[in-house]
Structures are given as structure tokens and as C-alpha cells.
């Protein structure tokens, strides 16, 4: 009988493989702070309290949490609060799922000015969806949507994209609801073109307003090269089929977007290379996580 591999949390992975990684990699101050918080979370390092049962007298030690937003152990309550808030917002109508992705040519700039670029992304997507919903050709009303930022893909490489969960309809000025056509919300090619235009405009304005401090592409020549690269690629907006009603939407939110990061350490089934077949070592996955 083969037993399932035990679940090992991120803190344990850092304890086991962190020293070897840190011996050859220097962490920026921000990442080092997160690293220390995850290791200290719910341990004696942060202190705690002793709880005693009034009936049997049994005692236990409860250690404090680090409350760092990157810590998997501390996200359960935040997840539950977020989900409860979204439950109050969901409408009893079909939903659509759209994905707005930034071209990888922007990855270097995103790494240098993440907050500014993420704000531009949210702004461009919000303005695009609002504009299309207000157009009488499509809905002619006020849009509602939930935007969720993802900054990496499954292999932990940088892949910045925004998921949009959009009700199939809009609210007119007189309070009436305008439903979208069955299985159709907005034309994808037009969405992509408008989204790119709004983002690139915001990018140029940010450079003019000196909001990209620290970026290495602000000089005229590298800036023109960046804009040419950005315009070379099609900005595809991916639209998935309708997600159905509120129950399906909430299921999607929970299982797709609120998964807590846990790394499973595989059993010692190694190939001739010393690695589990087809898998990276935990140390390699750790390197991608902190990169």
C-alpha cells in the first residue's frame, strides 16, 4: 500500500531548503522580511499564550501569527472575509470571465515599478469595461465587475494578468436591467484594441509625470524600443464561456483564486538524475518562488 506524501507547508520548505538557497542568493530587504515572518509564524519566536481547560486542567500553548499578507497560514480569515463580501455582491444572473494580459516585454518594467504598473492595469481594464458597457450598441448601462490580479503562472514565472468576472448585463440610468445577449458580452478584438490603447496612454503619462522612478528604460532610445516591442504583439483579451449563476461564480472564485500556496514534497522516487521523474526539486521550486 502506497501512502500519500505528507503535506508540507511553505515554512517547513524554507526551514529545510532555505539555508542552502540563502548561501548562494541574496534576498532584497522586503523579501527577507517576508521570509523571516513566514518562518516565525505560529512559533515561540512571536510569543503566545497558554490556554487551560477549566474542566480537565489540560493546557496547550497557542503561538501568535505573523499576519504577513504573503504567509499562507495567515490567509484563511482574510479569505473567508473576502468571500463573504463577494457573496453579498453577486447578482442572480449569468456571468462572464475575461482575462486581460500584459505582454512579457513589460516584465522588466513591472519588476522595477510594480505598484505603478499594477495601478495602470486596473485602471485600463476598469475604463475599458465601463466604456463598453456604457455603449448602447452593447449594453448601454453601468457595468459591474470583480477584478483579480495574478502576477505569475503555474511555473512561478512572471505573467501579469487581470481576471474579470462580469455579470451578463448592465444597469440603465432609470434603474432597469439590460441583459447581455446569450453567450456574448463584448467583441474580443475591440476589447483588446481599446485595452492596449488605454494602458499605453497611461504608461506614457506616467513617464511624463515622473511616476516610474528607478526604471531603466526612461531614456529616449530604450523607451522607444519598449513601446515598439509593446505594439508588436497583439494584446489578446481571453473570454471564457459564461460561468453561470452566483453559485458557479463563487465556486470559481474559491477554487481558482483563493488556493493557499502549499508545496508538497514528493516521496523519494528518483530518476537517474536524482530527481522525481518529471518534477523539479523543492529547492528549484523555492528558487522560482523567491525570484
Regions flagged by a language model, labelled:
Residues 1-291:
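Detector for conserved single-position "signature" residues within domains
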Amino acid at each position: 500500500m502506497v501512502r500519500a506524501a505528507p503535506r508540507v507547508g511553505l515554512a517547513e520548505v524554507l526551514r529545510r531548503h532555505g539555508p542552502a538557497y540563502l548561501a548562494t542568493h541574496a534576498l532584497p530587504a522586503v523579501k527577507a522580511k517576508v521570509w523571516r515572518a513566514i518562518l516565525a509564524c505560529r512559533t515561540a519566536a512571536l510569543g503566545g499564550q497558554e490556554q487551560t481547560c477549566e474542566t480537565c486542567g489540560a493546557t496547550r500553548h497557542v503561538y501568535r501569527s505573523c499576519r504577513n499578507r504573503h504567509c499562507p497560514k495567515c490567509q484563511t480569515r482574510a479569505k473567508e472575509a473576502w468571500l463573504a463580501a463577494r457573496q453579498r455582491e453577486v447578482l442572480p444572473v449569468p456571468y462572464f470571465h475575461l482575462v486581460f494580459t500584459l505582454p512579457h516585454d513589460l516584465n522588466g518594467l513591472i519588476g522595477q515599478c510594480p505598484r505603478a504598473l499594477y495601478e495602470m492595469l486596473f485602471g485600463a481594464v476598469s475604463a475599458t469595461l465601463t466604456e463598453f458597457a456604457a455603449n448602447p450598441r452593447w449594453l448601454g448601462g453601468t457595468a459591474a465587475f470583480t477584478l483579480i490580479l495574478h502576477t505569475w503562472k503555474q511555473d512561478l514565472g512572471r505573467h501579469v494578468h487581470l481576471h474579470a468576472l462580469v455579470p451578463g448585463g448592465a444597469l440603465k440610468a432609470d434603474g432597469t436591467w439590460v441583459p447581455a445577449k446569450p453567450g456574448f458580452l463584448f467583441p474580443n478584438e475591440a476589447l483588446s484594441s481599446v485595452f492596449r490603447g488605454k494602458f499605453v496612454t497611461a504608461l506614457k503619462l506616467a513617464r511624463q509625470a515622473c511616476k516610474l522612478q528607478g526604471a531603466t528604460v526612461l531614456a529616449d532610445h530604450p523607451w522607444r524600443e519598449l513601446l515598439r516591442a509593446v505594439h508588436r504583439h497583439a494584446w489578446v483579451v481571453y473570454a471564457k464561456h459564461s460561468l453561470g449563476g452566483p453559485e458557479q461564480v463563487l465556486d470559481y472564485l474559491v477554487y481558482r483564486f483563493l488556493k493557499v500556496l502549499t508545496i508538497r514534497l514528493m516521496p523519494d522516487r528518483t530518476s537517474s538524475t536524482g530527481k522525481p521523474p518529471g518534477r523539479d526539486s523543492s529547492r528549484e521550486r523555492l528558487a522560482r518562488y523567491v525570484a
